[in-house]
Amino acid sequence: VNEVVGEAVMYFRKRIPRNVTLDYNGLAIAPIEANINPALFEWVVENLMKNALDALQGHGSIDVRLSMDDQNVMIDVKDTGKGIPKSNWKRIFEPGFTTKTRGWGLGLSLSRRIIEEYHNGKIAVVESEPGKGTMIRITLKRFFDA
């Protein structure tokens, strides 16, 4: 997981404005294993970072963090952007829902489908406050060799 997320971060880092910082802790921790489709999973991480960048409106920070417990791998994408009202926390994952003037509202719904149906995981807003930012978490089962 570290490597795939790291590749997405490196790709994305080259495309962000100077007024935006992008931090990633995944290369500094031990390898984390989960059963993923690398191409689909990388697309989801890139989509979350792109949404975070859009929410920043040109300046702020995006923080991508990996962590794990006994059973799960958690990937957090946190921004210091405009935030999401609590009433929309679940709605943002519905097809067609968007707050952008340009967009189809399909990125997060497709992300949810990829995480839930192809990776047996979960994706959710875990914290957000209008004017302060948002954190979205992907949770996957850890992969253990038999």
Regions found by a protein language model. Give the residues of each.
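Short alpha-helical Gxxx[C/S/T] motif in the catalytic ATP-binding
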Residues: 107, 111-112
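Short beta-strand/loop element within the Bergerat-fold HATPase_c
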Residues: 59-71
